[in-house]
Amino acid sequence: MNQKIFLCSICNINSGTCNEDCKFCSQSVRYKADIDRYKQKEISLILKEAQDAYSNGALGFCLVTSDKGLNDKTLNFVCSIAEVLSKELPELRLIACNGTATIEQLLTLRASGIKAYNHNLETSREFYPKICTTHSWDERYETCQNINNAGLVLISGGIFGLGEREEDRVSMLKSLDSLKPTSVPINFYHHNEALELSPNPLSVDEALSLIKLTRAMIPDAQRIMVAGGRELMFGDRESEIFANGANSIVIGNYLTTSGKAMQRDLEMLKSLNLDVASSVK
């Protein structure tokens, strides 16, 4: 039986408005990166992106905002989008990724049609102060606990290649395993010249070993998803991610960087004799 690959697409419903100082993120207003910046994307455009993603095999669609966490205005905006998408595309699993959130806020999202919430730990508790000083790692962990307690599907992972040590990688993965996420997104840092952070880049072999390590250390996760940085990190060795434990990818564009055309990803999977998942377990 062929391995089935779960496809997900993400939509930046507001962009580049965050006041936090995460050193790896071009969406912070502090770094003045050359990216699109807008407060709210039109719902008609979001619906079109969701329809395109679903028609290309995506079962997950993530609504991403660029602030530290949910406030009333953002919560209402995400809920209004979810209500439209739930009606138009009932088979599409709606995911929210809106930063720190209380249980009450998460329950409101759930009532609007959101099924899952993505909040990454990013790195280890020990290393986090070196990449962000405006909020704590503990706040991130608490939000993940809130997601579980609100009855939403937890999606939580991190980003490799920030200059972290091997011990930090192991520490983060242990913390993630304690939260029992359904899906673990793995991102690989892509340097933007506007950002302060400029560590030595990972090798392809090192990145593949990190996918394998993630699968080994979080054995109960249904999906290990290779997300941001996939094309740039792996190049013509991209197909090797699946043999090393990945069974999910993000298709289409990322938040502030371009991905491959969706059709090219589908062609890659077909060439590897890998089927696209047709249902959410």
Curated annotation (Swiss-Prot):
Q: A single GO BP annotation from the record?
A: biotin biosynthetic process
Annotated residues that bind [4Fe-4S] cluster are located at C18, C22, C25
Reaction it catalyzes: (4R,5S)-dethiobiotin + (sulfur carrier)-SH + 2 reduced [2Fe-2S]-[ferredoxin] + 2 S-adenosyl-L-methionine = (sulfur carrier)-H + biotin + 2 5'-deoxyadenosine + 2 L-methionine + 2 oxidized [2Fe-2S]-[ferredoxin]
The cofactor named in the record is: [4Fe-4S] cluster; [2Fe-2S] cluster
Ranges for domain Radical SAM core = 1-230
InterPro entries hit by this protein = Aldolase_TIM (IPR013785), BATS_dom (IPR010722), Biotin_synth/BioAB (IPR002684), Biotin_synthase (IPR024177), Elp3/MiaA/NifB-like_rSAM (IPR006638), rSAM (IPR007197)
Q: Supply the Pfam families for this chain.
A: BATS, Radical_SAM
EC number, UniProt record: 2.8.1.6
Q: What keywords are annotated for this sequence in UniProt? A: 2Fe-2S, 4Fe-4S, Biotin biosynthesis, Iron, Iron-sulfur, Metal-binding, S-adenosyl-L-methionine, Transferase
What does the cofactor field's note say?
Answer: Binds 1 [4Fe-4S] cluster. The cluster is coordinated with 3 cysteines and an exchangeable S-adenosyl-L-methionine.
Name a GO molecular-function annotation.
Answer: 2 iron, 2 sulfur cluster binding
Q: What does this protein do?
A: Catalyzes the conversion of dethiobiotin (DTB) to biotin by the insertion of a sulfur atom into dethiobiotin via a radical-based mechanism.
- UniProt family annotation: Belongs to the radical SAM superfamily. Biotin synthase family.
Oligomer status and interactors: Homodimer.
* Protein name, UniProt field: Biotin synthase
